[in-house]
Every structure is written in structure tokens, then in C-alpha cells.
Curated annotation (Swiss-Prot), chain B:
UniProt-recorded name of the protein: Heme exporter protein B
Source species: Bradyrhizobium diazoefficiens (strain JCM 10833 / BCRC 13528 / IAM 13628 / NBRC 14792 / USDA 110)
Main location per the UniProt record: membrane
One annotated GO molecular function: heme transmembrane transporter activity
Entry keyword set: Cell inner membrane, Cell membrane, Cytochrome c-type biogenesis, Membrane, Transmembrane, Transmembrane helix, Transport
């Protein structure tokens, strides 16, 4: 199965149908292992049991950026290499990435309440992720604003790439802005070198969520291909009806002109 | 070169006409600044603390408002197609249009800043600092906003979508613009660092903006 | 699984529950969308439309 084969939508659909059950199974297994390990993880010295939120929060935060990276590569595929399935990949990834970003924000907020005493904190990381979430929503709006999927694809591709350039800039700016305004408290994750008892569940959950993304993404791509097929078939059907009604209308036109003439 | 200068002159002339939108931007700027005390309260001390932020926010929103028409008017009367098809590279044409827009719509905002600074109880130094940062930062706003305008040009109700697309891109400019102004007013932080980053953002947008806008136009107008 | 989740247990549970809910919504949307598209394709196939390549709408790979 070379990359060229993947360019053919029908073959791609065949591939997904074969691969999806395995991916789904692997995702479920890894999620189960990860959840089990998270439950068994010890309490943090400072944070207590709330450190368990990290096992959901960090993978989602990581994925929110990873998905934008995937969309950026897909956008390059659309603009530079004109790969037929690139825009399908980009469009399918956006809602999934937005959902992960939302989860990162929500769990970050729920983690923050015990830690900082407030649900929202204009911390550099939370703020950058919030802006990323806004960008996801803007991108999804752009996809749906243009009727023709392939034209929408090109506009969305440009926006995705501009956003990719802008994300490091935003992170840096917000970091600067944050140090300028001296946050009320500084978030500690137990240090940058995580203890193994935290690191392993975290990595397992990260891999599990990544597999989840791949599974959902392939399934969503399949849906998008089918949706485009439906659209083109519906257009064919509509033109067929219009054509046949034109043929039938020919005689009706004569009658109409006769009536007008009579009147 | 003459094609580009003709484009710039044409755009400026159109923008400065009554329906052109350049001076409307200043009016909107004034409106936003006037509305702020109604929301925040007439406490002059508070207003002068918020002053740079209010001015920057007003300038950001005002330039967003006028960016909508950067390509829309040309698209409607067909001249955008002519520009796309002409021999001058589309990137340079986009840069020229953005420059014209900044001259016609951005500069008046900067000129209006000292007057509005008075309304917000800002002293000369503060107002000067804000005006200087606006001078350095509004090109960034215009050139990145142009990307959103180009993306939205083929959409009929594109205006609001364009604002949503452009705002995340303008956040760094806003952050550093206000940081630089505050550095002059409040003090311990240096002015130079955020100001040079602001200039850097503008310079980068001078390059990326036209390329991204041209790509959007090319793909969107097929 | 009895473990003490400490004084902030509700936050931990809400986080995991929210994650489960969002993932469930994603899966649900994808599954429903798939069913909707295949239903449309079946209806189009029944009305005799073929794709440009001549293959039927319900081309089951």
C-alpha cells in the first residue's frame, strides 16, 4: 500500500474499513491500561490526588497542538502537492482537534481550581490554548462558509498554515505578557522531571489518546469522502431532473404562449 | 513600479472619499474610546491606567472594521480579477493595497491618538508612547488583517468571519504594543525590548501577509 | 476501585467524566454521520444514479 494508492478514495475507503476495527481495539486496550495505571498512581506530595487530572489534561493539550500539525501537513498537501485526500484529512481533523483542545481547557480549569483557587487563570499556557481553541473554531467556520469543498479546502489550507506559523509567536507573546503581569501564583507540575510512577501512566494515556485521534480521524475521513460522493450524486440527480423537466416543459411552453396570445 | 504606485494612489483616493471608509475608522476609534468610560466608570486614575490598553483596543477594532473593504469593493466591481490577471506579481499588488490601506486608514488613527489620550487623562509622554507603538504596530495589524480579508473575499457575509479569523493573529501585536506603552508609563520594564519585538512582528507580517493573501486570492477566485 | 481521591474528588471525577462525555459525543457524531451518509447513498443508488466512472453509488469496496 504505497502513498499513491492512498490517493485513490475508493482504495482509501477499503483500507479504512479493514484497519478501523484494529485501531479501535488497540485504542480501547491502551485506554483501559492507562486508566488503570492512572487510578493506581500515587498521590503527589503537593497536589494530592488531583494530580490524576494531569493524565487527562496533558495528553489532550499535547494532542491539540499535534492535530494542528497534522492539519498543517495536510494543508501543504493541498496547496503544494495537490494530494487528492489532503483536504479531506484537513477538514476531518478540525472538529476532533477542537474537541481535544476544549478538553485540555476544561480539565486545566478543573485542575486549576484546587491548585490556584480559581477556575480560570491568565496563565501563559492556558491563554495560548484558549487562543488555539478560537483558531480551531474560526477554521471550522471557514470550512463551512464556502459551498464547494475544494475551494473551501484551499482557503482553509492557507489559514491553517498561517496559524501554524503564528502558534509559536502566540506562545512566546503570551509568555512574555504573563511574566510582565506577574501571575498570582506559579503552577508546579511536580518539577520537569516527573517521577516514573507519574511518567508511565502519562505516556500510556498520551499514546492511547493519540491512537484515539487516529481512529476517529480515519473514520471522519471516511465520512467526509462519503459526504462528497453524496453531494456529487445529488447534483447529478438534480441536473437529471432539471434536464428531463426541460424536455417536458417544451410542450408546456407552447401552451403558455398560446394562452398569452389568446389573452 | 508605476503600476504599483498607481494602485496605491487609486486605493488611497478611494479610501479618502466619503464612502471610502478611512475616516469612518477614526470615527469608530473615537466611539470606542468614548464608550470605555461609560463601562469602566469616570475614575480618571483608573482611566489613565487603562489608557494605553483602551487606545490599542480601539485602534485594533477600528482597523479590523475597515479591513473588510480592502478587497471586497474591488471584488464587487471586478477590478480584483483585473489585478489578479495583470503582470505585476499578486504578492506585490496585495502589499501595495495594504500599504495604501495603512496610509489612508491607519495613519489617521495614529494622528487621532493624542486627542483621544486627553479624553483618557493620559499625559504627553504616555500619549507619545502609545502613538509610537501604534505607528510600529498598525502595519502588522493591516498586513495580517489582509490575510483574513483575502480569505473572506469570496464569502458573501464574510465580514464577521474575517474578524474571527484575524483576531487570534493580532493578539501578539496587541500584547507587545500595550507592553511597550506601559513600559514607558509605569516603568521598571524596558521599552526597547517589547518595542523591538513589535517592530519585528510588523516586518514579518510585511512579508508573510502579502504571500498568504495572494495565495488565498488565487485559490479563492478560481 | 476504592481509592481516596482526597478533598477535591469531585474535580477529578468531573474531569474524567467530561473527557468520557466529549469522546462519546465525538464517536456518536462520527457513527451517526456514517449512517446518514450510507443511507443517502443507498437512496441515491435506488433511484438509479451512477457515478461518473459508471460504478454504482453503493460501491462497497
Amino acid at each position: 500500500m504505497t502513498l499513491i494508492d492512498l490517493a485513490n478514495p475508493t482504495r482509501f475507503l477499503a483500507l479504512t474499513t479493514r484497519v478501523l476495527p484494529w485501531l479501535a481495539a488497540a485504542t480501547v486496550i491502551l485506554l483501559a491500561i492507562g486508566l488503570y495505571q492512572s487510578a493506581l498512581a500515587p498521590d503527589d506530595y503537593q497536589q494530592g490526588a488531583t494530580v490524576k487530572i494531569m493524565f487527562i489534561h496533558v495528553p489532550n493539550a499535547w494532542l491539540s497542538m499535534f492535530v494542528w500539525g497534522v492539519m498543517s501537513i495536510a494543508s501543504l498537501g493541498t496547496l503544494v502537492w495537490r494530494h487528492p485526500l489532503a483536504d479531506v484529512a484537513a477538514k476531518a481533523a478540525a472538529p476532533i482537534g477542537a474537541a481535544f483542545t476544549f478538553l485540555a481547557l476544561l480539565t486545566g480549569s478543573l485542575w486549576g481550581r484546587p491548585m490556584w483557587g480559581t477556575y480560570w487563570e491568565w496563565d501563559a499556557r492556558l491563554t495560548s490554548v484558549l487562543i488555539l481553541f478560537l483558531m480551531y473554531l474560526g477554521l471550522m467556520a471557514l470550512w463551512r462558509a464556502v459551498e464547494d469543498p475544494s475551494r473551501a479546502a484551499r482557503a482553509a489550507a492557507v489559514l491553517t498554515l498561517v496559524g501554524a506559523i503564528n502558534l509559536p509567536i502566540i506562545k512566546f507573546s503570551v509568555d512574555w505578557w504573563n511574566t510582565l503581569h506577574q501571575p498570582a501564583s506559579v503552577m508546579r507540575m511536580g518539577g520537569s522531571s516527573l517521577d516514573k510512577s507519574f511518567l508511565i501512566p502519562l505516556l500510556v494515556m498520551a499514546i492511547a489518546f493519540t491512537l484515539l485521534f487516529v481512529t476517529l480521524h480515519l473514520a471522519a475521513m471516511r465520512n467526509e469522502i462519503l459526504r462528497r460522493r453524496v453531494r456529487s450524486l445529488q447534483m447529478m440527480q438534480a441536473s437529471r431532473i432539471a434536464f428531463s423537466s426541460e424536455m417536458g416543459a417544451g410542450s408546456r411552453h407552447d401552451n403558455a404562449s398560446k394562452e398569452i396570445g389568446a389573452a | 513600479m508605476t503600476a504599483l504606485s498607481a494602485l496605491i494612489r487609486r486605493d488611497i483616493r478611494i479610501a479618502l472619499r466619503v464612502g471610502g471608509g478611512a475616516l469612518i475608522g477614526v470615527l469608530f476609534f473615537l466611539t470606542v474610546v468614548v464608550l470605555m468610560p461609560f463601562a469602566v466608570g469616570p475614575d480618571l486614575a483608573l482611566l489613565s491606567r487603562l489608557g494605553p490598553a483602551i487606545l490599542w483596543l480601539g485602534a485594533l477594532l477600528a482597523s479590523l472594521l475597515t479591513l473588510d473593504r480592502l478587497f471586497m469593493a474591488d471584488h464587487e466591481d471586478g477590478s480584483l480579477d483585473l489585478i489578479t490577471m495583470s503582470r505585476t506579481p499578486l504578492e506585490l499588488a496585495c502589499a501595495a493595497k495594504a500599504l495604501a490601506h495603512w496610509l489612508a486608514a491607519g495613519l489617521p488613527l495614529i494622528v487621532a491618538t493624542p486627542v483621544l489620550g486627553l479624553l483618557l487623562n493620559l499625559d504627553m509622554v504616555a500619549t507619545g508612547a502609545v502613538a509610537l507603538t501604534l505607528l510600529a504596530g498598525t502595519p502588522a495589524l493591516t498586513f495580517t488583517g489582509m490575510i483574513g480579508a483575502a480569505l473572506a473575499v469570496t464569502l458573501h457575509r464574510g465580514g464577521l468571519l474575517m474578524a474571527v479569523l484575524v483576531l487570534p493573529l493580532s493578539i501578539p501585536v496587541l500584547i507587545f504594543g500595550v507592553a511597550a506603552s506601559q513600559a514607558v508609563i509605569v516603568g521598571p520594564m524596558s521599552f526597547g525590548a517589547p518595542f523591538s519585538i513589535l517592530c519585528a512582528l510588523s516586518l514579518v507580517s510585511l512579508v508573510i501577509g502579502p504571500f498568504a493573501a495572494a495565495a488565498s486570492l488565487r485559490h479563492g477566485l478560481d | 476501585m476504592t481509592m481516596s481521591l482526597g478533598p477535591y474528588a469531585s474535580f477529578i471525577v468531573t474531569s474524567y467524566a467530561a473527557a468520557a462525555l466529549v469522546v462519546a459525543i465525538l464517536i456518536g457524531w462520527i457513527v451517526l454521520d456514517y449512517r446518514s451518509q450510507t443511507r443517502h447513498l443507498r437512496e441515491l443508488d435506488r433511484s438509479g444514479i451512477t457515478r461518473r466512472s459508471g460504478r454504482s453509488a453503493m460501491d462497497r469496496p
